[in-house]
Amino acid sequence: MGLSVVILAAGKGSRMNSNKPKVLQTLAAKTLIEHVVSSVEKLNPDNIVVVTGHLKEQVEDALQGRNITFVYQQQQLGTGHAVLQALPYLKEQKVLILYGDVPLISTEVLENLVDTTNDDDLGVLTAFVENPQGLGRIVRDKFGAVTEIVEEKDANDIQRQIKEINTGIYCVHKNLLQKWLPEIKANNVQKEYYLTDIITFAKADHVSINVTHPINEFEILGVNDRTQLASLERVWQRNVAEKIMAKGVSIADPNRFDVRGNLDVGKDCWIDINVIIKGNVKLGNNVVIGANCILKNCIIEDNVRIKSNSMVDGSIIREGAIVGPFARVRPECDVKEGAVIGNFVEAKKTILGKGSKASHLTYLGDSEIGANCNIGAGVITCNYDGVNKHKTVIGDYAFIGSDSQLIAPVNIGQGATVGAGSTIVKDVPADNLVISRARQRHIDTWQRSVKKTDK
């Protein structure tokens, strides 16, 4: 059974007060239309047609690389007119029609609509809502059959009391669209060609109208302004949080937790408030994430503690390691088992060996640090000469004293000790003590300068 999909994305979205089309506003770090496209792609349709209008180039760029046909609606003359523009690009099969600004629609709901609609039926997705203001109402006859869809602007007082609304999502064979779309008239307040008129044509042609409903009301909610966008963001995040908690993870406050990508979790993890997940993140078992942390494209293994106000990006934190508080782990780091990246430590493209510690106020860049090393406070690996980056290698069991600078490229041998306050420019052999600082002098005849005072 073949399927074509039409996504309507021509609207400007004036209430967004934005320089980009409404469908390119973001929810959970993805554009609204990307959410919709992702849902319909799982249906494996033969083709997807996106009808563009306002700033069409931006929409096409956002969906670049996907198997989509773009059709330009030069004049925004309504939903019926928009689908008419797509008609020549559709195959002789069922057509699923939906909107690019309804981001939470699920594949399951769409699949149910498609599967229950026969080739000679009209499938309509409707929903019952508490506040139908601004939405088209489903009008039924005394037998309960759908007779028409009335837009709010055209509805009378009785029709405005109806709670069942049109979601704007339909499934209908192309043959029926070819017959009905040219018959739509713009005889309404807006002077637009409403796709909803196909309900009337279906009744006149004795076409069966198949009505299905969404699993959750939020799935059919559209976005017209930034307030609605923020509301749907919280709905999305709450839904994600509940799925994560069902897998055995405790979240301190689901209302203060954001996933802007994909999170794979183990069991018995604890996630504190204001944690943000970006890209693809994997948590092992018994992981603790402190407040205000940001995790992006990283792997966190079992029994790791990420303390508050820390960032981990593009790196792997091995079992039992500790990061933070106030630490930043930049891309291409490998923090080995039991290692510590402490408070106000920044690491970039660095291997920190098993059991090694950089507990505070340190920069580790382009470094390879062995096991069981101690990196003192204020240590800096000076990796950049203004043109190129250079590597610092520190052997197992080395001790780097506080406030030392390691001028790369440089090697510190296994078991070597660097005295505090040293600037190291040459390799240090294994088990050596190296001190590079001025000798301390005492001058007992020195007098401090005294400021002149007004007489």
Curated annotation (Swiss-Prot):
Residues 248-455 are annotated as: N-acetyltransferase. Coiled coil: none annotated. One of its GO terms (cellular component) is membrane. UDP-N-acetyl-alpha-D-glucosamine binds at residues 8-11, 22, 73, 78-79, 99-101, 136, 151, 166, 224, 330, 348, 363, 374. Its EC number is 2.7.7.23, 2.3.1.157. Acetyl-CoA binds at residues 377, 383-384, 402, 420, 437. Gene3D superfamilies: Hexapeptide repeat proteins, Spore Coat Polysaccharide Biosynthesis Protein SpsA, Chain A. InterPro entries: Bifunctional_GlmU, GlmU-like, GlmU_C_LbH, Hexapep, Hexapep_transf_CS, MobA-like_NTP_Trfase, Nucleotide-diphossugar_trans, Trimer_LpxA-like_sf. The active site is at 360 (proton acceptor). Mg(2+) binds at residues 101, 224. Its main location: cytoplasm. It is found in: Cytoplasm. GO terms for biological process: cell morphogenesis; cell wall organization; lipid A biosynthetic process; peptidoglycan biosynthetic process; regulation of cell shape; UDP-N-acetylglucosamine biosynthetic process. Pathway: Nucleotide-sugar biosynthesis; UDP-N-acetyl-alpha-D-glucosamine biosynthesis; N-acetyl-alpha-D-glucosamine 1-phosphate from alpha-D-glucosamine 6-phosphate (route II): step 2/2; Nucleotide-sugar biosynthesis; UDP-N-acetyl-alpha-D-glucosamine biosynthesis; UDP-N-acetyl-alpha-D-glucosamine from N-acetyl-alpha-D-glucosamine 1-phosphate: step 1/1; Bacterial outer membrane biogenesis; LPS lipid A biosynthesis. SUPFAM superfamilies: Nucleotide-diphospho-sugar transferases, Trimeric LpxA-like enzymes. Its cofactor is Mg(2+). It holds the Pfam family NTP_transf_3. GO terms for molecular function: glucosamine-1-phosphate N-acetyltransferase activity; magnesium ion binding; UDP-N-acetylglucosamine diphosphorylase activity. Binds 1 Mg(2+) ion per subunit. Keywords: Acyltransferase, Cell shape, Cell wall biogenesis/degradation, Cytoplasm, Magnesium, Metal-binding, Multifunctional enzyme, Nucleotidyltransferase, Peptidoglycan synthesis, Repeat, Transferase. Catalyzes the last two sequential reactions in the de novo biosynthetic pathway for UDP-N-acetylglucosamine (UDP-GlcNAc). The C-terminal domain catalyzes the transfer of acetyl group from acetyl coenzyme A to glucosamine-1-phosphate (GlcN-1-P) to produce N-acetylglucosamine-1-phosphate (GlcNAc-1-P), which is converted into UDP-GlcNAc by the transfer of uridine 5-monophosphate (from uridine 5-triphosphate), a reaction catalyzed by the N-terminal domain. In the N-terminal section; belongs to the N-acetylglucosamine-1-phosphate uridyltransferase family. In the C-terminal section; belongs to the transferase hexapeptide repeat family. NCBIfam families: glmU. Homotrimer. This is Bifunctional protein GlmU. It comes from Francisella tularensis subsp. tularensis (strain FSC 198). The lineage of its organism: Bacteria, Pseudomonadati, Pseudomonadota, Gammaproteobacteria, Thiotrichales.
